[in-house]
Amino acid sequence: MPIPLHEVRERTFAGTRRRIFQLLVDMGTSNDVIWPFAAQPFMRSPGPLIPGKTEEWHNGFHAVLEEVAPEERIVWRIQNEGFEGTHGFYLSGDAKKTTVEHRIDATLSDTEGRLLWRRLEDANERSMEALFDKIARVLKR
């Protein structure tokens, strides 16, 4: 039986949506200053973010960009076997504070999806917390 997965992590930062959105856009490129684990790289295809074309790879996940709305959200369609859904960054806030929410909304298949999530769940939690910590440090510069 398929299992729904809804994971949300968020943090509020002292920074503008414009600045934080650009940091997220640069993740996985040569301009990346926020991905926290050099030994576990975040990679994405070169060039601008283009829905349906831009791909990303990290922590065992492969995804294709589904939607990008400047200063609001970046949403990726997960391509892994057993995962049907998305993960993305959603930004909200005012001129001085921005909340970044990372969401995974997916349906896991009985076997492949559950096993993959069990293997990646801890890495996802550590990565998101470390990513948020790194964003906070970069914004203080």
Q: Language-model segments: which ranges?
A:
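Hydrophobic pocket/interface hotspot
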Residues: 20-24, 30-31, 65, 74-76, ...
